[in-house]
């Protein structure tokens, strides 16, 4: 890392149209910080069944996560007004219908399941789209772009901290369905304002089909070229492992606290994760790194995995909280680095889709990690479970490191490097 003074975060927000665009995107993304807990509470109150509530949340989450890359491809292809805004409008309407159906007890379970799945299928990938816009907002300055991505990651994390608190307040004061309705309003309103931003409005969807080439073979679209997927493999593999690690770690923290007779203190472990992640993200963005993003990624994940393994060796909640803070301090930087690499892979034609695959990998890994470690908690000691949690990120880090070594040792024949190599730069740097 370099001691050169980095641009401040205020410099990022002072860029033309940056504050307006980022602010509108955050308002829309705040809906996702609210809606997950709001759906559980609303459906539970309407049906009297946690099983139904969990099922509705599951179909919403699965539809949202698994279909996100394809919705992102539509945005890359058709732009804001023909893809992003209609998605947000459809999702908002469906969430409003869930709020209306769930406002009173005795709601139809089947209707709630269908509405939940449909709303998830329409949920726009606002985070990846905003990260695509950052590359338009930020001039040709990699350090400033790193700052922007770090700020974006930290702000998104905070939305998922504040959102459940607001949902709880609305539930206590009124009805949980009001929180679902609020999320619909935030999603539609924020996306509508975002669409009026000049930088978002000018996003034309550069992944549109190429014009007629007069009988000549058109170039393979980057998203269909195998090399596109190879270049995206590293951030996707690492974030899948990171998601599994964090999903498992959160469950293990609860089990650890319960076995030490300190269940009430587990919230402090969660707080340590959240606060340290924000601090780590801000610190990471302030550093001018000499190492490339693809070199940093396995290093960050290796340290994070080691801290997870060490968490199984502590004997009290104070020690677990300290190591949770260390894990959290590296979480936002790891995600930021993965997002940067995804943007570097293909920022010109499928930047939103590339970033969305990273999101999908994290969310899928998170669910798998929680489920997997839950099965191991009974037969294995806690220390071994923490070791498995660390392995979730250590193994991808090792694979990525070996992959990079193999690519460096590969000798390319002069004149045979295709044009796409400029975009799929193995060092993750713009040509």
Segments predicted by a language model, with ranges:
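Loop-to-transmembrane helix entry/capping segments in MFS-fold secondary transporters
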Residues: 50-51, 140-153, 263-264, 348-358
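C-terminal ends and interior cores of transmembrane alpha-helices
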Residues: 89-106, 303-315
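C-terminal transmembrane helical hairpin of 12-TM major facilitator-type secondary transporters
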Residues: 294-336
């Amino acid at each position: 890392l370099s001691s050169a003074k980095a641009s401040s975060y205020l410099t990022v927000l002072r860029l033309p149209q940056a504050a307006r665009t980022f602010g509108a995107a955050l308002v829309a993304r705040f809906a996702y910080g609210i809606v997950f807990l709001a759906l559980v509470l609303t459906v539970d109150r309407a049906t009297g069944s946690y099983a139904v509530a969990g099922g509705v949340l599951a179909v919403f989450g699965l539809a949202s996560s698994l279909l996100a890359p394809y919705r992102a491809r539509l945005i890359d292809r058709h732009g804001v007004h023909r893809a992003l805004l209609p998605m947000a409008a459809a999702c908002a309407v469906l969430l409003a219908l869930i709020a209306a159906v769930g406002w009173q007890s005795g709601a139809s379970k089947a209707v709630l399941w269908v509405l939940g799945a449909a709303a998830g299928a329409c949920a726009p990938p606002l985070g990846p789209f905003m990260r695509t816009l950052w590359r338009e907002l930020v001039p040709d300055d990699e350090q400033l772009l790193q700052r922007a991505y770090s700020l974006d990651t930290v702000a998104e994390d905070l939305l998922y901290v504040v959102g459940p608190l607001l949902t709880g307040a609305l539930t206590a004061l009124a009805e949980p369905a009001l929180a679902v309705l609020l999320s619909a309003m935030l999603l539609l309103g924020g996306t509508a304002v975002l669409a009026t931003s000049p930088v978002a409005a000018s996003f034309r969807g550069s992944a549109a089909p190429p014009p007629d080439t007069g009988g000549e073979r058109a170039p393979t679209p980057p998203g269909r070229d195998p090399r596109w997927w190879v270049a995206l493999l590293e951030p996707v593999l690492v974030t899948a492992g990171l998601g599994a690690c964090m999903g498992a770690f959160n469950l293990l923290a609860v089990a650890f606290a319960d076995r030490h007779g300190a269940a009430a203190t587990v919230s402090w472990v969660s707080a340590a994760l959240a606060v340290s992640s924000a601090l780590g993200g801000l610190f990471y963005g302030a550093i001018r790194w000499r190492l490339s993003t693809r070199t940093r990624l396995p290093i960050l994940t290796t340290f994070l995995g080691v801290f997870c393994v060490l968490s199984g060796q502590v004997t009290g909640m104070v020690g677990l909280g300290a190591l949770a803070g260390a894990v959290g301090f590296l979480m936002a930087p790891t995600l930021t680095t993965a997002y940067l690499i995804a943007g570097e892979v293909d920022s010109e034609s499928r930047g939103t889709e590339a970033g969305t695959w990273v999101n999908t990998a994290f969310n899928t890994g998170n669910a798998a990690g929680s489920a997997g470690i839950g099965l191991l908690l009974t037969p294995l000691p806690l220390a071994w479970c923490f070791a498995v949690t660390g392995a979730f990120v250590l193994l991808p880090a090792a694979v990525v490191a070996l992959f990079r070594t193999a690519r460096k040792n590969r000798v390319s024949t002069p004149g045979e490097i295709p044009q796409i190599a400029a975009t799929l730069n193995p060092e993750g740097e713009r040509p």
